[in-house]
Amino acid sequence: MKIALYAGSFDPLTNGHLDILKASFVLADKVIVAIGIQAKKESLFSFEERVDLITQAGKELLNMGSDRLQVISFETLLIDKAREIGASFLIRGLRDGTDLDYEMQMAGMNGLMAPELQTVFLPAGVLGRVITSTLVRQIASMGGDVAPFVPANVARALHLKFQSSRGSDCVS
């Protein structure tokens, strides 16, 4: 069984992430989405919320059975988690040349430390090339419509998250 490991923060999951996830299923029997947990990095969504959002979007939009998609966390080196779960290869999405430069450095280091693990680069679709989780969070925080950039369940979750924070900023 070919197992792909697709790692990121997914805070929030975007349609660009889903494009890469969907393409991963062409190459792998199972895709494990690994959410990186960094104590120093403050996330908008908790790990549990991100698991739910990814799982729901994966099932709804990708029409995949739950046995082909798994969501886990990791706080170690990615290669250590990949070895632990028996991953066949790592998946990395590319939006542009800047991503390629960074990802080639990471793949090089990973290859030196874990030569048995290959990194597979998947190009983002045309619409996914301009989407970043950071931009989506900024748009949502200002009350903008993020529906074109994220799955419907994520758009709802962002709306609720920022609606409650904007409501608490109001002065009576």
UniProtKB/Swiss-Prot annotation:
Pfam families: CTP_transf_like (PF01467). GO terms for cellular component: cytoplasm. Pathway: Cofactor biosynthesis; coenzyme A biosynthesis; CoA from (R)-pantothenate: step 4/5. InterPro entries: Cyt_trans-like, PPAT, Rossmann-like_a/b/a_fold. It comes from the Bacteria. The record marks 17 as: Transition state stabilizer. Homohexamer. Reversibly transfers an adenylyl group from ATP to 4'-phosphopantetheine, yielding dephospho-CoA (dPCoA) and pyrophosphate. PANTHER family: PHOSPHOPANTETHEINE ADENYLYLTRANSFERASE (PTHR21342:SF1). Belongs to the bacterial CoaD family. This is Phosphopantetheine adenylyltransferase. It comes from Bartonella henselae (strain ATCC 49882 / DSM 28221 / CCUG 30454 / Houston 1).
